[in-house]
Amino acid sequence: MKNTDKKIAVFSNYKPQSKEVCQLLIKKLRQNRFILTDKNPDIVISVGGDGMLLSVFHKYEKQLDKVRFVGVHTGHLGFYTDYRDFEIDKLIDNLKLDTGAQVSYPILNVRIFLEDGSVKTKLALNEATIKRSDRTMVADVMINHVAFERFRGDGISVSTPTGSTAYNKSLGGAVLHPTIEALQIAEVASLNNRVYRTLGSSIIVPKKDKIEIFPTRNDQHTISVDNRTYTFKHIAKVEFQIDNHKIHFVASPSHTSFWNRVKDAFIGEVDDEI
């Protein structure tokens, strides 16, 4: 595909540095004869941080089979970004050499079944979390049609492999490599005593298994899907499963390996004497 055939959409957050980088990037893309359009793009470039990339993911979540993403970070290293703000020229050069290769990560499908029979479907790149709005949540958890436990606590989070480094990690969950197509269940402040017991640790669930959560109260619950929050009453159950689609990133020599992202985000440089 020639530069003049590639349709590219560019988005940034509202921070001055991101807007400045975005304007420079758009200028250089035009100089190199790329087509700039938000409608049915081949490549979507996010300028900002992981939060911005989550936003553009949801903007194009119905076109995942046709779109590849690129992240440009204007702060600290992000998990979904391959370029820093001072690497715009490198990004342009790699886009000119782009062959259509991609790096793909699994995403989460969330189905919310309401008592009136309606079903709401959401997609998550990082995680989805269900909580009762103002009281302790009580819910039955079923894994692959096995009644697993009755949960009592603040909520339950289900994350993707790439999302395992986000909210899931702060809940004490494990970090999963994205080539492991599995979901992870993490408890949010569970109640554990002589009367009420849960497993008390995160659970890795394989791709083929379905996670079902049945709230025992029909009052108001909140369901957070990445950086979006929804409120529902009268939830019959919520299903979590790996979606049939994946998110695709532009593969390039600059694509940072997952373990390098983890190291840079949480550990930093390792002492050579170790």
From Swiss-Prot:
Protein origin, superkingdom: Bacteria
Alphabetic keyword roster: ATP-binding, Cytoplasm, Kinase, NAD, NADP, Nucleotide-binding, Transferase
Active site feature: 50
Intrachain S-S bonds: none
Enzyme class, first EC level, given as a word: transferase
Pfam families tied to this protein: NAD_kinase (PF01513), NAD_kinase_C (PF20143)
Cofactor: a divalent metal cation
GO CC terms in record: cytoplasm
The keyword Transferase is annotated on this UniProt entry: yes
Catalytic activity, as annotated: NAD(+) + ATP = ADP + NADP(+) + H(+)
Positions that bind NAD(+): 50-51, 126-127, 152, 154, 165-170, 189
InterPro entries: ATP-NAD_kinase_N, ATP-NAD_kinase_PpnK-typ_C, NAD/diacylglycerol_kinase_sf, NADK
GO annotation terms (biological process): NAD metabolic process; NADP biosynthetic process
Compartments it resides in: Cytoplasm
EC nos: 2.7.1.23
Keyword Transmembrane: no
One Gene Ontology molecular-function label: NAD+ kinase activity
Matches recorded under SUPFAM superfamilies: NAD kinase/diacylglycerol kinase-like (SSF111331)
Principal place of residence: cytoplasm
Family designation: Belongs to the NAD kinase family.
Function: Involved in the regulation of the intracellular balance of NAD and NADP, and is a key enzyme in the biosynthesis of NADP. Catalyzes specifically the phosphorylation on 2'-hydroxyl of the adenosine moiety of NAD to yield NADP.
HAMAP family: NAD_kinase
Protein name, as recorded: NAD kinase
Organism annotation: Streptococcus gordonii (strain Challis / ATCC 35105 / BCRC 15272 / CH1 / DL1 / V288)
